[in-house]
């Protein structure tokens, strides 16, 4: 935006100030602007330049004040409202940022970047449908905006609309063929949609553009280890250096039965980092049982002691309105399915259920957060990282429903990207007397981990909980768990979720969106 001088201050002094800003001498521009403002407090240009200088130095809190001072003097400036929105976003004042973008749009309705940035704010606030509308408004103004299509794809994917997300990512790529993040995100969404062959092509396209792309390397590694190509997977994890890459390498070594290399790396990781990886805890526990050695990884050495089950009052009460609404939303809301190879006679939702707009899901999320706090209080005296490093911010890495029918079951697995995992039970089959059909079973073995001595199989203990409707079960994410098959002619419906670890910035999804 062009900057015009004001007669309220000496034109030569103002020009010197503008020259300092335009030449990148931001600290000097800041100093000059403050000195001039002390003498000419009502000169718009001085506050504007000061805001830009502060913004450029990442002094966002101060920049917010300067933008606001400038707007008090001249309020009909859409670019200034837009810049204010960006600065407010940087200091996490999201409601105010959204309002600034709305003001920019009011002043300039075709300001497509403001529509896009408003979408990112709404998405961060979990207002996915509003975010989608905002992105679409921006794209109606400028359909050639590749980044706008990318951001739309991230919101659609979060909202569980995988086909529409795939279309949005493909459009972004058509507009900008070298859009590495779009190729990678397209691959992730195709994977969730069950088209692994096309997903791999997308990862490879991303890596052809940027061989060091962390997410694409991670995703290729994940594909290779699922294909049991462990040595190839390790190389990609090494290149990714992303999130839990060291745990994934340990997994590959263990599944390949390269136990010597596994033990060497486990010891190194245990000595160099805090014991805050549930995934490594799973592997360390299995190795200790397998070889009859002590488990020194202190995430949660006795995970069976940390399984927690209790009813949620709002769901267990007779004729629960919340229970009825949750079941209605699961059965009738437009939520795409995610292909899940471990699930038999059932379906699993795609996207992040607790980010959806339905009030029932949001209410349940808040009730679950209360149970997280109750869990932490119950085990507050425990001397293990599960409790000592319990996340202070209660966020969900993921959330989804699982709906099974007669004969349904889920194979033993863990949630690698969780800290604390759990499920709330909304419908349960009636088991035969003395039977634990449909129960939640947990243990220390699963995923075809190698057992060196068949005589040790009984050392890998299991236990189970038979939940009632309205119950919540919480457990360390390091525990294997499964659903025991049931034969009753009834649905078994639960909503599962993971508490986000404090020590991981993000999952392996690269759904970064911004203008």
Give, region by region, the residue ranges found by the protein language model.
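Structural marker of alpha-solenoid helical repeat scaffolds
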Residues: 39, 73, 107, 141, ...
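Conserved alpha-helical positions within TPR/SEL1-like repeat arrays
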Residues: 18, 22, 45-56, 79-90, ...
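Catalytic core of non-heme Fe(II) oxygenases with the double-stranded beta-helix
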Residues: 359, 366, 373-474, 484-485, ...
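Residue-level recognition of tetratricopeptide repeat
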Residues: 43, 77, 111, 145, ...
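Non-heme Fe(II)/2-oxoglutarate
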Residues: 296-388
